[in-house]
């Protein structure tokens, strides 16, 4: 049975939504639910916990990570604490910083350390896995296309 390390969006579970769909397709899931006690931790502690788990249990070329929305944000912060992840990574609708309400006609949001990922990418200091892809819908208001395209160009991650 193939195993996937899953990081769902904020408030996400491994047994619902994307996690449930992957389990229904025969995948074994590990990862972090982004709710409960884990969600209450400061971002640096969340990123450290994820980095430690990946290095201890998923550190090989055959490993697979799927990170969705805020889970992708957590993965990228964890990635900044370790060498390039050796496996395959799929980032779905990744949050990579703040989104302002005026540009989208909806309420905006700003995750903790909202500008850090783009700042590291612009400096060429953001470590990314060799096998990483970003997939996002054209109308996903939480992932502005122009920012993701810039992020992809800066990091070499296909969008």
Where are these regions (language model features)?
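Conserved alpha/beta-hydrolase "acid-adjacent" motif
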Residues: 14-16, 141-147
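Gly/Ala-rich beta-loop-alpha elbow adjacent to hydrolase catalytic centers
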Residues: 66-76
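Active-site nucleophile loop of the alpha/beta-hydrolase fold
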Residues: 34-37, 90-100
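Short beta-strand/loop motif that positions the catalytic acidic residue
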Residues: 127-129, 133-136, 140
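Catalytic histidine neighborhood in serine/cysteine hydrolases
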Residues: 28-30, 153-159
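Active-site nucleophile elbow and catalytic-triad environment of alpha/beta-hydrolase enzymes
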Residues: 107-125
